[in-house]
């Protein structure tokens, strides 16, 4: 993910800073304890697509709908 873009992105809920988790390919808001996925290099900043960081990444991974 482009570092210049990371400087501009904020949590869509609290407008707080996000941390890039390279291991899980997510942007993490520590204040809201949510992780937003990065898919094909694009951050999905929708609350409905975020997972609680209390929940393991594998549990909340959405099914691959591209067939």
UniProtKB/Swiss-Prot annotation:
Belongs to the UPF0434 family. This is UPF0434 protein Lcho_2556. It comes from Leptothrix cholodnii (strain ATCC 51168 / LMG 8142 / SP-6). Signal peptide: none annotated. The lineage of its organism: Bacteria, Pseudomonadati, Pseudomonadota, Betaproteobacteria, Burkholderiales. HAMAP family: UPF0434. GO terms for cellular component: cytosol. InterPro entries: Trm112-like (IPR005651).
């Amino acid at each position: 993910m482009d570092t210049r873009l990371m400087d501009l992105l904020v949590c869509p809920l609290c407008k707080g800073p996000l941390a890039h988790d390279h291991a899980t390919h997510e942007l993490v808001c520590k204040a809201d304890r949510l992780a937003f996925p990065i898919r094909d290099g694009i951050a999905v900043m929708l609350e409905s697509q975020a997972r609680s960081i209390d929940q393991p990444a594998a549990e909340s991974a959405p099914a691959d709908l591209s067939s």
